[in-house]
Amino acid sequence: MNRIALVFLYSLFLFNLAIGRVESQTCQCIQPDPSMLNCLGYDSKLQADTIDEAIASFPDLSLNDDVANQKFSTADVGCVTKECQDCRKDMRKQLQKVGLLAKDINDIVASQVDSNSTCTKYGFTRQQQKKSHDDDDDDDDSDSDESKEEEEKKKRDRKHRRDKRQAITQGSQNNTDPNLIGTRFTISCAMKGVSVDPTGTVSLCSSCWVWRQLPSNYRPQYINELVCDNTDSDCLSGYATCSVGHRTFEAIRNDNGVQTQVTLTAGSYCECRISKSSSLQSLVEGTGISGTYNPLSNHTTPV
């Protein structure tokens, strides 16, 4: 074999090796039977077989920020930067807070996210940093009493929704869907009307970023989901309702040693849908506004 051919083969080897490294960051594989060559591939951004894998690879689905997600998925594979390490530390604290990760007896880390964290990967870390910044501003602020009163009312409303959501989370999160396999843990939620998009557009529905832990006989064990906030299911001031959209995924179920590949569903997005009989239907169809507006008194089937 001549020298040119050897150089070509070596270059091809390096190329395939590089491609394999990139793919390994997003595609993992479960081998149900070690004696067989076939395996079940999965996207590590949406599924994980261990909690550490989920912490390392799950993006915040409540943030429509592809640039930030791409930055964290490729720029720091070894997690050597302070920002990456802060993100993992903040996520472990959050998982302990919601009950998905048990606190170690030797864990001396505070339960609250560090306000000095450099992590911008997650919505809850951004909120904590913003809250810390706002508190600092309040110390030097000379706004009127009326403005402060209005801001305090907003804070009380947000706290009420958060407390209500946490009560549901700490209780039985699956009551809203008795057919759901596994247990959902709410990581954070994004309120409707709050900008979560780099373009400045706002969402019509409040949504929650949740991690679902499947029963112990399922692999991969953890699912990354986005669902509607079940404490705030209305949109457009009650003229419409929020509905969750689903995606399907594959998993392996072990039934007393018998491995079975199964198809399950996961929450993928939350959208605002109007009732078919709503006066807003003409607005959706592009024919203008007709009729009077009667807010939904009950949740009819949306279109």
From Swiss-Prot:
Keywords: Glycoprotein, Signal. Residues 155-164 have a biased composition (Basic residues). Residues 124-179 are annotated as: Disordered. Disulfide bonds: none annotated. It comes from the Eukaryota. Residues 135-149 have a biased composition (Acidic residues). Residues 1-24 form the signal peptide. The keyword Disulfide bond does not apply. Glycans are attached at N116. Residues 167-178 have a biased composition (Polar residues). InterPro entries: Cystine-knot_cytokine. This is Uncharacterized protein T16H12.9. It comes from Caenorhabditis elegans.
